[in-house]
Amino acid sequence: MFEWIADPEAWISLVTLAALEIVLGIDNIIFINILVGRLPERQRQSGRILGLALAMLTRILLLMSLAWIMKLTAPLFTVFNQEISGRDLILLIGGLFLIIKSSGEIKEAINHQEHHESESKNKVSYLGVLIQIAVLDIVFSLDSVITAVGMASHLPVMILAIMIAVGVMMFAAKPIGDFVDTHPTLKILALAFLVLVGISLIAESLDIHIPKGYIYFAMGFSVVVEMINIRMRRLMK
């Protein structure tokens, strides 16, 4: 079980995989922060930690169910000459959920009224938020687990890389969430990014591959432009 410790390639895989898991977890952090942002202030930090803990647990359970994951790629049925597998269905449903949820959040932000926000926050339950996080964690975990399987040959290395990545994300989640909450335009940008991720998940379910690098580059470029705008607005005050 621990023979990988003496293998230099295993350590290289561990570092590389942990870094990739952090990058692949960015959309997960954004989604969790958007959801816990609707909770009362005192519950937000515990919501973030529990949400990321659920993400880690989901990834580890999926890793330990590798045989089941491999079966998900087997065709279940065919629609218009397109073979549909279990993985495709999960990605399709997850993508639709992300688009609907994020679009609803954008609409609410545009039609924002203080009394309406207050009412909506009271309607959101802690358990309800955790259930939504758990459901989307399954979708977000698929890419993460498939990447882990493709990059490392030792299960302990994969699990350790995921634990390191989630640990880093737990520290980063609050500062990112607070910063996004302080700048409403960044929140809209984050929600638009989640819509884009939802579209890419649906495309992936239809065997149309959109490189994630393109999505992350577009998001990164947009964030840089928005940071310049924020800086300019501060200087003009």
Swiss-Prot record:
Q: Give the CC-aspect GO terms.
A: plasma membrane
Spell out the subcellular localization from the entry.
Cell membrane
Q: Which domain of life is it from?
A: Bacteria
Q: What stretches pass through the bilayer?
A: 12-32, 49-69, 90-110, 126-146, 151-171, 188-208, 210-230
Listed InterPro entries: Integral_membrane_TerC
Give all cystine bridges in this chain. Answer: none
Bilayer topology: Multi-pass membrane protein
User: Do you know which Pfam families this protein is assigned to?
Assistant: TerC
What keywords are assigned to this protein?
Answer: Cell membrane, Membrane, Transmembrane, Transmembrane helix
Q: Mainly resides where? A: membrane
- Record family assignment: Belongs to the UPF0053 family.
Q: PANTHER family given for it?
A: COILED-COIL PROTEIN (DUF2040)-RELATED, INNER MEMBRANE PROTEIN
Instruction: Specify the protein name.
Output: UPF0053 protein HI_0056
| Organism, scientific name | Haemophilus influenzae (strain ATCC 51907 / DSM 11121 / KW20 / Rd)
